[in-house]
Curated annotation (Swiss-Prot):
Disulfide bonds: none annotated. Belongs to the universal ribosomal protein uS17 family. The gene is rpsQ. GO terms for molecular function: rRNA binding; structural constituent of ribosome. Coiled coil: none annotated. Keywords: Ribonucleoprotein, Ribosomal protein, RNA-binding, rRNA-binding. Gene3D superfamilies: Nucleic acid-binding proteins. This is Small ribosomal subunit protein uS17. Transmembrane segments: none annotated. Part of the 30S ribosomal subunit. It holds the Pfam family Ribosomal_S17. GO terms for cellular component: cytosolic small ribosomal subunit. One of the primary rRNA binding proteins, it binds specifically to the 5'-end of 16S ribosomal RNA. GO terms for biological process: translation. It comes from Prochlorococcus marinus (strain MIT 9313).
Length: 88
């Protein structure tokens, strides 16, 4: 079985070893054909607490880690400019 992957933006990093990632899904409306965007928020495991708000990340599906956590952060694609200023 292939693992599911999603690309998204970190919207919250206030929990220990957990981040909330917003993934935007765009699709045409079945009747009107207008592009509709839906945002889904996933809780993902961040083992090193390296992600900050605004970072672009890739998350992969995994076994259940808690009641609401079924995704892990596979890699950080780009850091938020705001997060880079704080760390330096």
């Amino acid at each position: 079985m292939a693992l599911k992957e999603r690309l998204g933006t970190v919207v919250s990093d206030k929990m220990d070893k957990t981040v909330v990632v917003a993934v935007e899904n765009r699709f045409p409306h079945p009747i009107y054909q207008k592009t509709v965007s839906r945002t889904t928020r996933y809780k993902a495991h961040d083992a090193g607490n390296t992600c900050r708000v605004g970072d672009r990340v890739r998350i992969t599906e995994t076994r259940p880690l808690s009641r609401s956590k079924r995704w892990t952060v596979a890699e950080v694609l780009s850091h938020s400019p705001k997060a880079q200023e704080v760390s330096t």
